[in-house]
Amino acid sequence: MIKPISRRTVLRGTGAAIALPMLEIMTPRLRAGESSSDKVARMVCIYTPHGVRNSTWYPEKTGFGYTMSSTLDALSPMQDKVSILTGLCHPRMASNVGHAAAGRWLTGVNDGDRVLVDFASPNKAFSVDQLVANSIGTKTRWPSLQLSTEAGAGVPGRSRTLSFNARGLPLPSMNEPRAVFNRLFVPETANDRAAERVRYQRRQSLLDNVMSESKSLERRLGRADRERLGEFLASIREVELQLDRNQKWLDQPKPEVDTSDLQFAFKNRSEFLKVMYDLMFFSLQTDSTRVITFMSGVEVDMYKWGELGVNKDYHSLQHHNGNKVDMEKLSKVDKREADLLAGFLVRLNETAQEDSSMLDHTMVLYGSGMNNGVGFEDGKGSHSTRKLPTLLAGGGKLGIKQGQHLVYENDRTPLCNLHVTLMQSMGLERDHFVDGKERLTGLS
């Protein structure tokens, strides 16, 4: 018979302790990394909440040579490097998942309500960006960046991050531009580095003791608890790897960037998005990271776009019930976001890399996990998970065939096929991702 242990049981290191996860036994039976000659591939995933106003966002014509919609007009100068992908979805997902869509956008999680409880699923809710970061992240100081309008991971069903590790745990986002800049570019003093090295050593000692003590505890556990403990210890190993990575980069100088155009004192959402796009550009240009996720707004976004003359919060605006005035305001917001995206893409496109541009070596995915309308019509403000607005820019040197408006019919083409395309274009040898079993047709 397995003897129960206390819920207060901890694994003790020297001078510190780490609490265990809840186990059944606790209840009575019951670098800027490489040289410029390297083939550098990058991936950026940008999420806009609540969907878009369909009638003014989608181009009317399909195929090559389409005309950008009024909302996306700022992208016209780069149309040969931008594709609109119409009709993608997560086919096995419920047609309406409320505001849990953001957490599912890059994961393809589709097993009902469990994602609302703990973000996780049997496939571990591994987001495609983190799968890529796990493969190439050792080449840069930061394996990936998670950015958002709101900091942290959020709460179940209201994610503030798009990124989930292999165990389904959300990776918290940063939302303070100055803090992002400091992390990326402000050098530590010699004293700072010495103090940080001491902290690394203490943490490593604690983790070593915890791992050692866990082995004796494991013999007392049942099968289910051993699995839970195994997942817990896997997270400890991840921390160890991160400590090793941080120590490796500790004495590597951080890159210098021209900050003359950076405006950290933003007054509204438009200015905030602009400075975040600037920081994203600098992080890619300096090869500080090659994988970025960015939420340009969270689901149930309560911001009022006052700079556009909008006097209703974004979330309420999305529940327009067919009101034409509100839908016109939505078009204004959609266009402002597209204009800011275009500025980011132009900057990548105007920056040389090898025989082309940074944009040709960078795939930028922009879209939403929610369709605000019905099909391709405006509707009355829904939370549909079908026919998701999706745009892919760049990646011409990574095998992406750009300059198209592609339409996928019948709500059967998985968004995860696009994720397979992203992974393979980033150099991963994988032929599936969740329900994505092949590259997305038409892009290569």
Regions found by a protein language model. Name each.
Residues 1-444:
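Ligand-binding pockets and gating/stacking loops
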